[in-house]
């Protein structure tokens, strides 16, 4: 089993990033795929049209999300913790995922960087409401 941890800078305030990660319609906007999500502990979720499924464990509005991601019959839960920190450029999103099966690690690491984080970054960089004017 492996662990993944990385920080990503998202060009939006933590409150907005939190909503993008916890509101189904917003998830669908930035992923382009069907999503099921309720920001309530002990509820099931599905992202990217069932590519990622699991159970929500904990929420701290605007700051933290803890989920269990399912990997088939794996005996130990893979726990994902996302912490959102204020950053001069918006939000520092800290991602930590534990108990990743060795055979899935490269795909998971690539997915976090090239799909999950990149999708959020692109969503907010392209958002005219954010007023991304250069100073």
Task: Identify what each model region corresponds to.
Residues 1-36:
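Hydrophobic ligand-binding cavity/cleft-lining segments
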Residues 5, 12-13, 44-48, 107:
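Alpha-helical scaffold segments that form or flank carboxylate-/histidine-based iron centers
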Residues 12, 51, 114-115:
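Generic recognition of short, well-ordered alpha-helical interface segments
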Residues 21, 31, 60, 69, ...:
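Short, flexible helix/strand-to-coil boundary loops that buttress conserved ligand/catalytic motifs
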Residues 26-29, 40, 129-135:
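Structured surface interface patches that mediate subunit assembly and partner/cofactor docking
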Residues 28, 36, 43-101:
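Hydrophobic-ligand binding "helix-grip"
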Residues 99-135:
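A conserved amphipathic terminal alpha-helix motif
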